[in-house]
From Swiss-Prot:
Enzyme class: transferase
Gene: dxs
Protein name: 1-deoxy-D-xylulose-5-phosphate synthase
One example of a Gene Ontology biological process annotation: 1-deoxy-D-xylulose 5-phosphate biosynthetic process
Keywords assigned: Isoprene biosynthesis, Magnesium, Metal-binding, Thiamine biosynthesis, Thiamine pyrophosphate, Transferase
EC numbers on record: 2.2.1.7
Length: 630
């Protein structure tokens, strides 16, 4: 079937099971071929082909609402709703988004990039439906570990209490990104082997009613014996106790079983949870055999061999630099523990996990818990290293404020994927952390200019005992610089002059330092002398350095790959104002006040005007012509 000709899912209504099976093969082939060129979340989508087709066949989207959680499972949904022809642009600038996007299609009713939000949103939609007295199904599809998130459990509790009509699809592939962890995962494991409790209960009631004379009376007591029955037949009754009708487990690749179960769910009042067992990566051997999450989300790859197409790496990944330095220090300090919220592979903690399994803690998709747990460990003299993506640290803001900073606890937060991350887009750009951490009392915030300085700042963080400290580091690789053998502590709040200059100064840090250095060199050739400063401590700032610089009364430009509002540049402006430098000219470059879409980092930087050319132009506008050398 030519998938690019699909306009909407209505064509599925008339298809037989054998035709649907052929469509499944076509979709898997399409995904494998297309994603080999663009990269993307291949394994999660190969696992939900039959489930997605079954949902679109039995329900009526967009009247009926599908909410995908996590949203990277929505590729098949996008194909069935008329977007196959755009897959060549997947996750590229102004191309097809890798997550549901409301502006893309009326079938995308909810946007998800972070996990565990679908049930709360679905509850809101269902309550709105009931208040408006309309009739549509609300169907959140939750999987890839999203059910372990605290927000999802809060929603389950409320939905079950209110008995709201809703069909929750639990897509259980036994993995999130890496293998699932936690007691809830164990509950699901028992349910997978428990058989179909509800089918048995209904059969028993039917048989009881057939008994002459007493059958009706006996059947009337069925509800009273329901608890005993479910404990007899099901080893895990978690969802029933929360107030849901539990259906399953059902084979998520068997159309007959899916149709039977979903039709039953449609006729059931109150909240229903359909437990669907799927195989992550189904139909592509390299993805099927993956047990650690390598094929969860990928770049381009070679279909036949399963080898990834990667540019030759001349420098280590930032995540590896940080995690391996932590590991090196952990070998001589038993107090060091590593904590991750379901991202051991992305944060490059596999080596730490292998060497110190009892000191490596993966809490699952539970950022709030991970953060406060780290705080608890710090109260007992441990040295927790919390490795967390910038975008996911947003979810633990209150815990950072209330539990870490307020108590001034020695927690080292490794803020991975800081700055623009590219293809994952606006839900994942790590551009807000400076603004929401800089204003917190007791917090120290750093970002290195290169991987050598990065390892020294990790050492600095582990030696620091006066409160919380955080290190920002980017997605991708370092610069390939020489790495010192011996680690050293860098004085807290100290900046570094990278290039001397007399007519203007650029204050920056991290990934924008190469941009600043190149701009300064070009300006030097044009007769403009510009100082470049490595402001590696975003907080506290080097106040002595700032006093000296502001006292020279030369234009200052701050550059940051982070949002301008409340950012580093704002801090410099505040310092100048509060210390009486009212004639100082301080201008800022950074991320504007909007969400940044998906695309390559280079393209996105061009789009927002954060380039070497833009820096050169800005400095020229800041320096009066009469001050420029010929």
């Amino acid at each position: 079937m030519d998938l690019t000709q699909i306009q909407n899912p209505s064509f599925l209504k008339e298809m037989s099971i054998s035709e649907l099976e052929g469509l499944s093969e076509d979709i898997r082939k399409f995904l494998i071929e297309e994603l080999s060129q663009t990269g993307g979340h291949i394994a999660p989508n190969l696992g939900v082909v039959e489930l997605t087709i079954a949902l679109h066949k039995l329900f009526d989207s967009p009247k009926d609402k599908f909410l995908w959680d996590v949203g990277h499972q929505s590729y098949v949904h996008k194909i069935l709703t008329g977007r196959a022809k755009e897959f060549g642009t997947l996750r590229q600038y102004q191309g097809l988004c890798g997550f549901p996007k409301r502006c893309e299609s009326e079938h995308d009713v909810w946007e998800t990039g972070h996990s565990s939000t679908s049930l709360s949103a679905a509850m809101g939609m269902a309550l709105a439906r009931d208040l408006k007295k309309t009739k549509e199904y609300v169907i959140p599809i939750i999987g890839d570990g999203a059910l372990t998130g605290g927000m999802a459990l809060e929603a389950l509790n409320h939905i079950g209490h209110e008995k709201t009509d809703m069909i929750v699809i639990l897509n259980d592939n036994e993995m999130s990104i890496a293998p699932n962890v936690g007691a809830l995962h164990n509950v699901l494991g028992r349910l997978r082997t428990a058989g179909k409790y509800h089918w048995v209960k209904d059969e028993l009631e039917y048989i009881l009613k057939k008994i002459p004379a007493v059958g009706g009376k006996v059947a009337a007591t069925a509800e009273k014996i329901k608890d005993s029955l479910k404990y007899l037949l099901v080893s895990g009754v978690f969802f029933e106790e929360l107030g849901f009708t539990y259906l399953g487990p059902v084979d998520g690749h068997d159309y007959e079983k899916l149709f039977e179960t979903l039709q039953y769910a449609k006729k059931t009042k109150g909240p229903v949870l359909v437990h669907v067992i799927t195989k992550k990566g189904k139909g592509y051997k390299p993805a099927e055999s993956d047990v650690i999450g390598t094929w969860h989300g990928t770049g381009p790859y070679k279909i036949e061999s399963g080898d990834f197409v990667k540019p030759k790496e001349v420098a280590p990944a930032w995540s590896a630099v940080v995690s391996e330095t932590v590991l090196k220090l952990a070998r001589t300090d038993e107090r060091i523990v590593a904590i991750t919220p379901a991202m051991p592979v992305g944060s490059k903690l596999e080596k730490f996990q292998k060497e110190f399994p009892d000191r490596m803690i993966d809490v699952g998709i539970a950022e709030q818990h991970a953060t406060t747990m780290a705080a608890g460990m710090a109260t007992q003299g441990m040295k927790p290293f919390l490795a967390i993506y910038s975008t996911f640290l947003q979810r633990a803001y209150d815990q950072v404020v209330h539990d870490i900073c307020r108590q001034n606890l020695n927690v080292f937060i490794g803020i991975d994927r800081s700055g623009l991350v590219g293809a994952d887009g606006e839900t994942h750009q790590g551009v807000f952390d400076i603004s929401f951490l800089r204003h917190l009392p007791n917090m120290v915030l750093m970002m290195p200019k290169d991987e050598n300085e990065g390892q020294h700042l990790v050492y600095t963080a582990m030696q620091y005992e006066d409160g919380p400290i955080a290190l920002r580091y980017a997605r991708g690789n370092g610069l390939g610089v020489h790495m010192d053998e011996e680690l050293k502590a860098i004085p807290i709040g100290s900046w570094e002059t990278l290039k001397e200059g007399t007519q203007a100064a650029i204050l920056t840090f991290g990934t924008t330092i190469p941009m600043a250095m190149e701009a300064a060199e070009r300006l030097e050739k044009a007769g403009v002398s510009v100082k470049v400063v490595n402001a590696r401590f975003i907080k506290p700032m080097d106040e002595a350095y700032l006093h000296d610089l502001l006292g020279k009364n030369i234009p200052i430009l701050t550059i940051e790959e982070a949002c301008l509002i409340g950012g580093f540049g704002t801090g410099v402006v505040e310092f100048a104002s509060e210390n009486g430098y009212h004639s100082a000219l301080v201008e800022r470059m950074g991320i504007p006040d909007r969400f940044i879409e998906h695309g390559s980092v280079t393209k996105l930087l061009e789009e927002i005007g954060l380039t070497t050319d833009a820096v050169v132009d800005r400095i020229h506008t800041m320096i009066p012509s009469k001050q420029k050398r010929a």
